């Protein structure tokens, strides 16, 4: 079968559509925000592919994985196993890094375990194996009359009852063992929990340091080394000494443990720094740790949200000194992962090894180098392998997973991606497109939800969903190549591809007389740069990925403005409009966040029906007792656990999903009850409340930023990052202008926006500037860049080769700068 055939898809706003998607091709699904792109790509095609795979598993396996609901579609033929690479998957695990996610760190651990050269953690000299005589001499240096146990480790932190091991030791004539730190006699009944990890040390001898013990100690030492596989413990009342026949420093008397991959794992007790448990950070909670842990559990916040400092023991490297003392080409594993991907790639490309090490490392280095190359190919060469996953943007984490998938070299798979071009400069976009085509050429079907013009034009096939959003969307408007789409007059995408519609370059640029100076900025990769940020105009900060844009604006400028008194500049406050969720609970929605819900509740409370019943505004909230349905607690659905099947959510049979009780629903405004109003999309509500200025003003701005398709009561945790950002932008714009102006900072507000939505967004941003506010935007979108009054271009590259001011000026001035990638993209637009 050469295509995926979808018949009768009705998920969300899809209107019973049927479409054929060619297999083994790069297919772009596009359309305005809310038109139904994700509903088709993720909630229909991917969801069904995933469900069919899950269904093939045993019921025992399914109880751990959960079976997704069957999408509302009549039939899908030609599906392959599906993998979704979206931006919503954020890993808040503080142990997850770029290196661990891409598996590069696993190969590095193996490499250091096989060819790494151990050094003494104390003096730094290369270590060598100790003979029995050397170990004997070290023990005899203990003070006279020191009592000690000579122990041989026979079981190291392994699960099981270990009955056979204990029986063999008893049969060999030994009397005692130390199990999990406690002395036990071998002639007693020893029963160990099978499911727990245990450590067993054989007591070979008990001695006191004095003259005449050398011969006995030598015999016992040889026995201990034999049973302990070359390792022996000497336990005194004060400390435990470790000796090894394999790796030890003669000068310092320090023995190193076996060099295994686990030694370099900060997730293993064998390698993790004991002070910070492998996190590299210690939480600044001092004597209140237990209280903070209790508060974190009760109030549902992460312990990682607490103040933290670099671990004083490992200095943020996460590992024990023994692991950090193993080196390749004078670098330990922490120093390697702290390099940028690009620098790491160069390090291994120029690594000189002897013939033996080269043979051992050949396959490992091949895997490492291929993964580093894939990261460079998707424009992430500026990241370090030690970078925490939780600090990555949605676009970065998505491209990391994309690079990982290419590394796996799977074929016959259906990949579904959500705007992989987010966060990418035009210069990096070519690398991404080459990567997507490589994934396709491996024999995979690649479906991309995308708005980027370059990606759309590079697609083998385009599916345009629309024409509008919400109820006005959900239909296949056009399908074919970019050229074929551009000829369809009913297609908004076609309008912009053909040039029938376009975002015009402003005829004039605002000039500024005031600015915010930044001097000698040197954080992260910024190289002592000085720049002036204009006030009272629209400034766009540009540059390739990793050039230092976010560092300059979000980590230097924004904190500085928050601390400074801005009154002398006639500025009220500085506001960061980011893509963080607008609500932390499923009960948050667009109406509650913007304050529209308060006005709507007051409106219902003023109706005759409410006055007759004595209802106040609080009666019309599903968050408090009184007006909400108590059967479902105002959720509208009931959760039914199904054990090995996924939890089932059924509509509440009391309120029928309306969230309110019958008495509350009896109160109506213009023929609609409160549940009817909350289910209205913004555009419908705008018409419904046309005569209520307080509500209309807010809804009008939501419409202006392209959110007319979102229902007033839609749960905020279903919003994308771009939608959440535009809700915040609309909220700010709808607020009455104060006596003083504000500074607004935004990071890629065009995320998730179609050409037509970008046009609306630019109009809204220009309205903020027109009323006297300052707007600073970090952006790659050329339509936003060409609309700026002033551009600050960073670069010239990312990571270590970035962090410099390449150019400053108007778009026209920037377009003539020769060493600027942004200039190259602007030349055709600003003539």
Predicted regions and their residues:
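Conserved phosphate-binding elements of NTP-dependent enzyme cores
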Residues: 1-831
């Amino acid at each position: 079968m050469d295509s995926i055939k979808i018949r009768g898809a009705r998920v969300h706003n899809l209107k019973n559509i049927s479409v054929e998607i060619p297999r083994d091709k790069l297919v772009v699904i596009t359309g305005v925000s809310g038109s139904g792109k994700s509903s088709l790509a993720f909630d229909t095609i991917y969801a069904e592919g995933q469900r069919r795979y899950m269904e093939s598993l045993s019921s025992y396996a399914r109880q751990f994985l959960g079976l997704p609901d069957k999408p509302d579609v009549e039939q899908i033929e030609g599906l392959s196993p599906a993998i979704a690479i979206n931006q919503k998957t954020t890993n808040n695990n503080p142990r997850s890094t770029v290196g661990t996610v891409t598996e590069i760190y696993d190969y590095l651990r193996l490499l250091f375990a096989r060819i790494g050269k151990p050094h003494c953690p104390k003096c730094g000299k290369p270590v060598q194996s100790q003979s029995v005589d050397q170990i004997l001499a070290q023990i005899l240096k203990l003070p006279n009359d020191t009592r000690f146990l000579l122990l041989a480790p026979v079981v190291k932190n392994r699960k099981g009852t270990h009955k056979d091991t204990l029986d063999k030791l008893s049969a060999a004539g030994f009397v005692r063992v130390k199990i999990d730190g406690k002395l036990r006699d071998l002639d007693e009944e020893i029963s160990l929990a099978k499911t727990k990890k245990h450590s067993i040390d054989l007591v070979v001898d008990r001695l006191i340091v004095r003259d005449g013990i050398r011969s006995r100690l030598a015999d016992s030492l040889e026995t201990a080394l034999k049973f302990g596989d070359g390792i022996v413990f000497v336990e005194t009342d004060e400390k435990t000494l470790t000796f090894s026949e394999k790796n030890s420093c003669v000068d310092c008397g320090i023995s190193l443990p076996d060099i295994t991959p686990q030694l370099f794992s900060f997730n293993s007790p064998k390698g993790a720094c004991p002070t910070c448990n492998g996190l590299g950070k210690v939480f600044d909670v001092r004597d209140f740790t237990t209280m903070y842990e209790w508060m974190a559990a009760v109030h549902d916040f992460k312990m990682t949200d607490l103040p933290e400092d670099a671990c004083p023991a490992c200095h943020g490297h996460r590992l024990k000194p023994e692991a950090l003392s193993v080196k390749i080409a004078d670098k330990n594993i922490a120093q390697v992962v702290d390099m940028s991907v690009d620098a790491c790639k160069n390090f291994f490309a120029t690594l000189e090894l002897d013939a033996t090490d080269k043979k051992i490392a050949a396959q490992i280095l091949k895997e490492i180098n291929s993964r580093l190359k894939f990261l460079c190919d998707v424009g992430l060469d500026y990241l370090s392998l030690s970078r925490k996953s939780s600090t990555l943007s949605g676009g970065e984490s998505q491209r990391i997973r994309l690079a990982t998938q290419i590394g796996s070299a799977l074929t016959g798979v259906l990949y579904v991606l959500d705007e992989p071009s987010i966060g990418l400069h035009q210069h990096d976009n070519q690398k991404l497109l080459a990567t997507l085509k490589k994934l396709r050429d491996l024999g995979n079907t690649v479906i991309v939800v995308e708005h980027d013009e370059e990606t759309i034009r590079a697609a083998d096939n385009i599916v345009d969903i629309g024409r509008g959003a919400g109820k006005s969307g959900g239909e296949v408007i056009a399908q074919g190549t970019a050229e074929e789409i551009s000829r369809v007059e009913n297609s908004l995408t076609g309008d912009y591809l053909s040039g029938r519609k376009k975002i015009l370059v402003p005829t004039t640029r605002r000039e500024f007389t005031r600015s915010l100076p930044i001097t000698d900025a040197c954080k992260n990769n910024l190289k002592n740069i000085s720049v002036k940020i204009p006030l009272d105009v629209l400034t766009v900060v540009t540059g390739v990925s990793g050039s230092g844009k976010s560092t300059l604006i979000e980590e230097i400028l924004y904190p500085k403005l928050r601390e400074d008194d801005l009154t002398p500049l006639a500025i009220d406050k500085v506001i960061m409009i980011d893509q963080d969720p607008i609500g932390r609970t499923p009960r948050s929605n667009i109406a509650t966040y913007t304050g529209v819900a308060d006005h709507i509740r007051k409106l219902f409370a003023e109706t005759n029906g409410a006055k007759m019943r004595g209802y106040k505004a609080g009666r019309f909230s599903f968050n408090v007792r009184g007006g909400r349905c108590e059967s479902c607690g105002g959720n509208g659905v009931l959760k039914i656990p199904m054990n090995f099947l996924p939890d089932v959510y059924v509509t509440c049979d009391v309120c029928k999903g309306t969230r309110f009780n019958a008495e509350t629903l009896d109160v109506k405004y213009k023929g609609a009850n409160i549940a009817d109003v909350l289910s209205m999309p913004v555009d419908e509500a705008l018409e419904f409340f046309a005569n209520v200025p307080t509500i209309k003003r807010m809804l009008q701005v939501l419409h202006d930023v392209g959110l007319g398709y979102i229902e007033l009561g839609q749960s905020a945790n279903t919003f994308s990052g771009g939608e959440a950002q535009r809700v915040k932008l609309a909220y700010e714009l709808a607020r009455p202008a104060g006596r003083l102006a504000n500074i607004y900072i935004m990071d890629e507000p065009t995320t998730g926006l179609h050409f037509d939505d970008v046009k609306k967004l630019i109009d809204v941003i220009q309205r903020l500037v027109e009323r006297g506010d300052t707007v600073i935007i970090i952006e790659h979108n050329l339509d936003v860049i060409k609309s700026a009054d002033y551009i600050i271009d960073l670069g010239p590259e990312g990571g270590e080769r970035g962090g410099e001011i390449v150019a400053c000026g108007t778009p026209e001035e920037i377009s003539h700068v020769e060493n600027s990638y942004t200039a190259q993209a602007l030349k055709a637009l600003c003539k």
